[in-house]
Amino acid sequence: MRRQRIMSMISGLALVAGSLFAGASLARADTPPAEFGTDWHDPITADPPLTRPAGRSCEVTLAAAQFRDFTPYRGSYTPPEACPGPWAKVVLRLDGKVKGRQYDRLGNLTVDGVEILRTSTPQPSPDGITWSVEKDVTRYTDTLRRPGAVEMLIGNVVNDTYTGVLDVRVTLTFHTGRPAAGPGRGTGGGAPGTARGTDRAVPDRVLPVTAAPVTTPRNTERLLAEVYATGSGGGCEEYWYLTVPDAAPYSCKAAEGPYREVRISVDGRLAGIAAPFPTVWTGGWSNPFLWYVTPGPRAFDVQPVTYDLTPFAALLNDGRPHAVEVSVAGVPAGQSGWSVPANLLLWQDHGRRTVTGALTRHQQTEPVNTPRYTAGSPHRLDTTGGHSLTVSGYLDTSHGRVTTTVTRTLAHTSAHTWTDGEDRDALTAEWRDDETVTTGGVTTRTARTHTMDGETTLGADSRLRTVLGLGDRADTTVYRPGRPASRTRLDHTYTGDATYTYGVPRDQRHAVGTTTDRYRLRTPDGCYDHTLRTAQGVLVEDSSGC
């Protein structure tokens, strides 16, 4: 079957950053119906809820809008007078509701040009759903200290067929107190922080990356970049991991196949590489019944790709404007569909007005991207890809010379098979993104692995079935002189199996489906293990325990 047919359930898309409340921690079992009805459980994830510090807090409404088209909400932000800071934590919360019929839609929110939220929406039931998302935005404290312009957009289409209006409210809650120190120097998902002079979790400055050159403070001693990289917004880049070279008879083409790599450069020189996360949106794999209650990993939490650019700080500290640019390797020339808004997070040396140093090492391997097509029944595309980059530099700070070395290694393998007409379409894929950051005697090693294993089939009876497994894993170890190694492990998995009658009105689909969402996190401070299971839109298990 043509990709346009089999993927017709996924049109425009979007993404959300944050954690949905997981609900009750006790096991729970409701009796599911024989098939999906006109209503189902509100969207929920197994992600851990955010902790909130005790003490005084203040709430500010950041945006409130009903999105019917592509008109952005524009407003203004003023810091809370009753909670002037410092802030131990700032929590963004999005509350949404929608009913009727609608696709999943892509959205983002900026304050003074700094993107602090990227989000997508769930698909509604005819009777209506509500959902809530929370995100820790403490790292944007520099932006939130000052009044600024707010812009939010969740592009939507409302007409006689697609009736769902997206009603959204976004708030910020400011918890007063001193922010905690960061757990380590790596960019593996925790709050930033490191030994010696930059053990502060919250950066001193946050600068949006735009088309214009950027000028950084001359006493910058640590520099991260974050990129909210999403392949979405229509066209085949919404499911880039399924694209094939031009020679293969498949409906989604990309001359170089499915390998993608998010790159950041400074003044035209490669400064960082990363594997994009293969997000499956809430209409993905031709089957919205997989996602109505439990979205896949990160589908409601667009986490930015993060780079440690500290080796380049000496070059940027000259007081002159510099070009910082983001690109996605593997995207066909002229092809749209990727969004890569980026921010720079900077820590300053408060003991020195100017920090000098040098970039001392820049070494990369030749990028590998080898898609091999084999004709037959089924057709098959085997792809391998990879790249490695090492950069090193030093800074002469007020607390001595500090050398930072960053090594990033990417590896990808996938096997994509499909039949003529694409009535059967299957993919098994793995992305590895390994990073080592050494600075001031502290080494942080992070091994990230993302997996996808799924198959969609369309039978002679027009029953469309999707069986899919997704994995999001990260293993981070911090080595400090004279101390035991500190390890953090994340293992977030999703499995689903859903079937419905294709090409008929919604009330004739006779859909059935089961899903399991399990989030496991083990840190030096303890563990978290939460499992959600659904059947036909009913939550049949909600259990926690390590």
List the predicted regions and their residue ranges.
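Feature for soluble, non-membrane regions of globular proteins
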Residues: 90, 207-208, 215, 238, ...
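Extended extracellular/luminal ectodomain segments enriched in beta-structured repeat modules
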Residues: 82-91, 216-224, 235, 405
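Flexible, low-complexity coil/linker segments
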Residues: 151-223, 347-398
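Secretory targeting and sorting signals
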Residues: 1-29
